[in-house]
Amino acid sequence: MDSRRSLLVLALIFISFLVYQQWQLDKNPPVQTEQTTSITATSDVPASSPSNSQAIADSQTRGRIITLENDVFRLKIDTLGGDVISSELLKYDAELDSKTPFELLKDTKEHIYIAQSGLIGKNGIDTRSGRAQYQIEGDNFKLAEGQESLSVPLLFEKDGVTYQKIFVLKRGSYDLGVDYKIDNQSGQAIEVEPYGQLKHSIVESSGNVAMPTYTGGAYSSSETNYKKYSFSDMQDNNLSIDTKAGWVAVLQHYFVSAWIPNQDVNNQLYTITDSKNNVASIGYRGSVVTIPAGSQETITSSLWTGPKLQNQMATVANNLDLTVDYGWAWFIAKPLFWLLTFIQGIVSNWGLAIICVTIVVKAILYPLTKAQYTSMAKMRILQPKMQEMRERFGDDRQRMSQEMMKLYKEEKVNPLGGCLPILLQMPIFIALYWTFLEAVELRHAPFFGWIQDLSAQDPYYILPILMGISMFLLQKMSPTPVTDPTQQKVMNFMPLVFMFFFLWFPSGLVLYWLVSNLITIAQQQLIYRGLEKKGLHSRKK
């Protein structure tokens, strides 16, 4: 079996292994190894936990609901505690062509996913006995045309202390400022600790084996740039990490919500699960803030709730852009995504951008492709001599190996010359695979005709079938030294195997492979013409 076909088999096995491995990781992430401490019975970390002396009571009556809106999202805030209970992403449809905004945060009987925040500690206003009931005039607040930011303050007064919970919306940004301004006129110093947490129903990661997706927690700390912490991890071992910088998040396919506390103070990152109600929380607890009598203090934090936009997230917090997880192929995926985005900005079609990127990749690899076919042609010419050596030294494998290496050297043939282009294309393919799984820019991105979502599988399986046909043609047009009938049958079956395997892959990825095959066929014919002139190839079968 020639090297090219052998590596096609290896490529299929390798891709299958990577997909299965990632699916297993998403279903069963590795056990947490970073140093953690248990949350004790005396802790007042805010969550619905029996061991929590200052836990937030979930049974409290909801307050008034107000709406905040800028040009990219619409938020609903509960004035009881000031939690974000809904976020509608105005630039993203819930389903393809549905015209209904995608709702990321939501609170229903079937599913809870909300962003809670408050003040706990010695003089906290969010305790088991009750939460702050904020006051505000009006129900709807919208960023006006020409405005770059909008501040919406909620007011609460208690024991001579005025608390303002201020939400800051910015134009074109999914980054919501959540600040506290505290005016202490009580006559004595007070101490509070800020917290923010994401409360989510415990669910399993979704998707299929070909396109697995992760739903669960993640965090960043001063010791760990980025780490997933699944709901099963939370159920097995509650997280508790002290860090000066960092953030906590809940991830799902293409979207993320993340609390980013003040990065200049010490924070505790934690998780708490409520198995009875099937919910889990991942959050942070800030350092104690002391406000002397007659003084004011401002406590800052921010909440990202929106799509995984790498460039924007990188400016919000260190390592937040790592939630776009390209796996081990990130060093290839990032420049490929940049190139895709650049070309899409010119052609205004992601499908055309994929075709252009494929052309660029094949052009870069052309010298290696030419060397591959030249090496294969020389190897075919050497087949009679190699067969003669097998007959002469069949019992002396060491001598036969030495003679063959000598023959390769004399004829200036690299026996592995046919492998390199395929080996280089494999990580490129894997990088594109993760790009299509992770890049929200490709979600619901149309091509032409029946392909209206390049991030989803072809609904009619036309592209996988065309890809299989192109692979079959490429195989038939490539001379092979395979003489064993069994091996030949296996190779003839490979296009069908690949076609079946690609039925569930993103259509954009199948488009890449199809165009790559077509370009390879064209390059092959061009190379063969040159080889014919050198007497290294004949079109006669």
UniProtKB/Swiss-Prot annotation:
It is a multi-pass membrane protein. GO terms for molecular function: membrane insertase activity. GO terms for biological process: protein insertion into membrane; protein transport. Coiled coil: none annotated. It is found in: Cell inner membrane. InterPro entries: Membr_insert_YidC, Membr_insert_YidC_N, YidC/ALB3/OXA1/COX18, YidC/Oxa/ALB_C, YidC_ALB_C, YidC_periplasmic_sf. Its main location: membrane. Pfam families: 60KD_IMP, YidC_periplas. GO terms for cellular component: plasma membrane. Keywords: Cell inner membrane, Cell membrane, Chaperone, Membrane, Protein transport, Transmembrane, Transmembrane helix, Transport. The chain crosses the membrane at residues 6-26, 337-357, 416-436, 454-474, 495-515. It comes from the Bacteria. Required for the insertion and/or proper folding and/or complex formation of integral membrane proteins into the membrane. Involved in integration of membrane proteins that insert both dependently and independently of the Sec translocase complex, as well as at least some lipoproteins. Aids folding of multispanning membrane proteins. Belongs to the OXA1/ALB3/YidC family. Type 1 subfamily. Interacts with the Sec translocase complex via SecD. Specifically interacts with transmembrane segments of nascent integral membrane proteins during membrane integration. This is Membrane protein insertase YidC. The gene is yidC.
